[in-house]
Amino acid sequence: MILPHVARILLWLGGWTAVGGKPTVRKAVLIAAPHTSNWDGFWAIVYKVYMGLEIRWFVKDSMFWFPLNALLRINGAIPLDRKRAGSSVTQAIEAFDEFDDFYMGLAPEGTRSHTEFWKSGFYRIAEGANVPVVLGFLDYGNKRLGLGPTITLTGDRDQDMAIIESFYSSISGHHAEKMGPIKLSR
């Protein structure tokens, strides 16, 4: 297939080094941080294609109009019905039951802007679906992107977030001033 070769060339042209391998688990919540630029999504898709990963993520259903819907679906997007009774967390947990192999990609900050807390959805989804969390990253300071460790949540949010914060502490976003603390709201 030619797409992984195109992705490799794009990474090279962008000056990026891809690190880490494929996850060793069949299902996981894959978080990508820090998220400070529109370019993050582009480079995440290039990395996904380069590595041959099937990563899915939610996109609000109003974005699924022709011809954008085809491009979104090809790249792993799942429409999120924001009007549906229940939460997006519930929809994500249900999605894990639909597939034998499933990686749900999320940006835990929930925005490209500075925020004081990460959204807790990734944590609640992983707990509810009983799957681990894979730590994905885009380190603009060192031009490295990839997948870090796989974390099995303990249920102790403080302990789990300390491990996650330790991993991301040396990673710099495209707009470092937009990076906030790595912690969940109470």
Sequence positions of predicted segments:
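Active-site-proximal loop/hinge segments within enzyme catalytic domains
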Residues: 178
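Soluble catalytic domains of membrane acyltransferases
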Residues: 11-170, 175, 183-186
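Helix-enriched interaction subdomains in cytosolic or periplasmic regions
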Residues: 1-4
